[in-house]
Amino acid sequence: DGMNAAIANTMNKDYAAAKRAIAKDMSAEADYLRAVIASEEGDMRTAEAQLKSAVKKDEKMAKKAMKDIHFKKLFEEGLKF
């Protein structure tokens, strides 16, 4: 399953492989994971865009994101959904 492979690759810091594993997955969960990966890579602009896309698809992602350390900086900088 692409999502499980992507999560495992993200945990192992193999971000390129993680992105490939979910490249065709357009779900809210995949967008959220792409936001996490972008955050890990220091690309906060992409992290914000992917996070907003995830929340647009599934409002519950907003609550999850507010508790996620990966996005603390975005919220401190005024991110709103």
Regions found by a protein language model. Name each.
Residues 56-81:
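Terminal, low-structured helical/coil segments at or just beyond the last alpha-helical repeat
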Residues 26-28, 39-63:
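TPR/TPR-like (Sel1-like) alpha-helical repeat modules
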Residues 1-43:
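Alpha-helical adaptor scaffolds
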Residues 14-25, 46-54, 78-81:
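Alpha-helical repeat scaffolds
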